[in-house]
């Protein structure tokens, strides 16, 4: 009941009805019964991931993937001969997340390792991202998806953006203006990459993340406690 007026309330009951044939309202009194019923059905072959996709006549599945993801399961699925296409979607949000310098540096270091590109400046990071962008294209990617709180369109110069990268990569916090400039620059960079390959660019706009402070401390970020920003 605490999800009422949140899309999760409708989505949850829609899935229970259409996928599992369950009409009950999910609440503390029915949770165990529904949980057990769903798990019993999930043991059946027709309720496996592939079974469900076949049941709903799915032709293509597009996942959401970070630039540093290996896409190994996309490759394995394709090589297995599975008749439904599984394609990656480029979701580079963490490359724009400069609010916490330590987290940003850790991400850039992972990007450098995965791309095999030494990163010490802004241009290096863009080169590494472009290499991963090429890899995603090789695996059939045709879409990008960007989770943003607003459409960033702050004026900036290349000199400013390079200095901002050096500052945050060096561990110094940024001002609000610097954050907006950096995010604006990255949206342009990603837009150019997508345009060059003819990809469709999508914006997951206005979602408020990590609303539940208790669960954020327990589980970490992006674990399902989002809502629509209004």
Go through each PLM region and give its residues.
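Metal-cofactor-binding active-site regions of metalloenzymes
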Residues: 1-197
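Long, well-ordered mid-to-C-terminal structural blocks that present hydrophobic/aromatic surfaces
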Residues: 173-230
């Amino acid at each position: 009941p605490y999800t009422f007026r949140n899309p999760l309330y409708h989505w949850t009951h829609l899935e229970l009805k259409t996928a599992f044939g369950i009409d009950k309202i999910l609440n503390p009194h029915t949770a165990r019964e529904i949980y057990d019923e769903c798990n019993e059905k999930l043991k059946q072959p027709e309720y496996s991931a592939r079974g469900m996709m076949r049941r709903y006549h799915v032709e293509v599945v597009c996942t959401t993937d970070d630039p540093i993801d290996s896409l190994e399961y996309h490759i394995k699925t394709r090589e297995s001969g599975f008749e439904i296409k599984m394609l990656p979607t480029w979701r580079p949000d963490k490359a724009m997340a400069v609010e916490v310098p330590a987290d940003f540096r850790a991400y850039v270091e992972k990007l450098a390792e995965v791309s095999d590109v030494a990163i010490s400046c802004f241009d290096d990071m863009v080169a590494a991202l472009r290499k991963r962008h090429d890899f995603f294209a090789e695996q059939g990617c045709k879409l990008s998806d960007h989770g943003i709180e607003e459409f960033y369109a702050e004026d900036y110069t290349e000199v400013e953006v390079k200095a901002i990268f050096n500052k945050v990569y060096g561990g110094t916090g940024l001002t609000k203006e610097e954050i907006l400039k950096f995010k604006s620059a990255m949206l342009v960079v990603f837009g150019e990459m997508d345009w060059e390959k003819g990809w469709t660019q999508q914006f997951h706009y206005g979602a408020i993340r990590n609303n539940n402070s208790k669960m954020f401390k327990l589980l970490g970020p992006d674990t399902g406690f989002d809502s629509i920003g209004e």
